Design a protein with these regions (language model features):
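Basic, amphipathic "hinge/linker" alpha-helix immediately C-terminal to the N-terminal HTH DNA-binding motif
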Residues: 68-86
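Helical "lid/switch" subdomain of P-loop NTPase nucleotide-binding domains
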Residues: 47-48, 79
Length: 101
């Protein structure tokens, strides 16, 4: 179901899932996205928490801890498979364009 819900991932989605390869909370996710993307992708709180809710609802990530307002998440096996498929899709696109651009 998750794969059908998210046919392709937007850049913020992709980087959020990469950040969640390790357990972390929202503030840490925003910082990791910025670091992993070398500052190209900046995810604001509104976008982040909307995506986290959709990802959790679809079993892409899971809640690991909740302390007051601070919640931590990690990617699930479903999410890892989805991330891998998106990586392969992007890699294929780059290869298709190689030598043509």
């Amino acid at each position: 179901m998750a794969r059908e819900q998210f046919q392709t991932l937007t850049e913020p989605m992709y980087y959020i899932l990469l950040a969640l390869m390790e357990e972390c909370c929202g503030v840490d996710i925003m910082e990791k996205v910025k670091v992993i993307s070398h500052g190209r992708v900046v995810v604001g709180p509104g976008t982040l928490y909307a995506m986290l809710a959709k990802f959790e609802e679809n079993g892409v990530i899971r809640l690991t801890a909740s302390e007051g307002r601070r919640k931590s998440y990690i990617i699930t096996e479903v999410g890892k498979e989805m991330l891998k498929q998106e990586y392969e899709r992007l890699k294929t696109m780059v290869l298709d364009g190689s030598g043509r651009v």
